[in-house]
Amino acid sequence: MASLFEETFNEPLPSRLRPDNLDEFVGQTHLVGKGKILRRLIETDSISSMIFWGPPGVGKTTLARIIASHTHSSFIDFSAVTSGIKEIREVMKQAENNRVFGEKTILFVDEIHRFNKSQQDAFLPFVEKGSIILIGATTENPSFEINGALLSRCKVFVLNALEEEDIVSLLKHAISSPKGFGNMKIDISDDCLHLIASFSNGDARNALSTLEMVINNSDEKDGIIHVSKTIIEQCTQKKSLLYD
């Protein structure tokens, strides 16, 4: 039977390195920097219904998980990809039961834009009467993809693609952290880190996945893994123009 350590390291690198708190969270300082509105809402457990809108890999799901770890409310993680009206009704029933006993329910719906208008309508009465606090995550413009009545009851927070320096910081953390490659000797230049970051287009998950692939496919000599620009280009199937 695999040990917990082995099972953990079978997880993809982005999952292993997912931050547990806001101090570890990288980027989105306009929302979660010291004194900013979303940080205050999370730290005071004063969450109201909201939509996280931004491109892939910028921290939407991570912020929801941080909220889950800080709130005293019941937290339900829900995917629009694998759920339908039946599952929505079951969750709403659970939320109603929680409300009877004085417990709030936060419902996180990943890829909420995947729900059609009628499915989104099913949330509306429960949001209106406070049975659930809805947190939706979407890569699509909420004005076009979210029911207007539901959207009017949610605060939209816009998450931006990460800056290259933010990505480089994440990559360095991945190399040094015991949850990443901290137990390995890795030779990788700052130029190579910036190259991976530039290829990621502000997507932290993409950058970390690329780093994992690059390290797993780099040559080892005398116990040291040597990362080159060539292997990065091979793994990403992209050619560097800025770093030649």
Where are these regions (language model features)?
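Conserved catalytic/switch belt of AAA+ P-loop NTPases
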Residues: R39-E43, V109, H113-S152
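C-terminal engagement/docking regions of AAA+ P-loop ATPases
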Residues: V227-D244
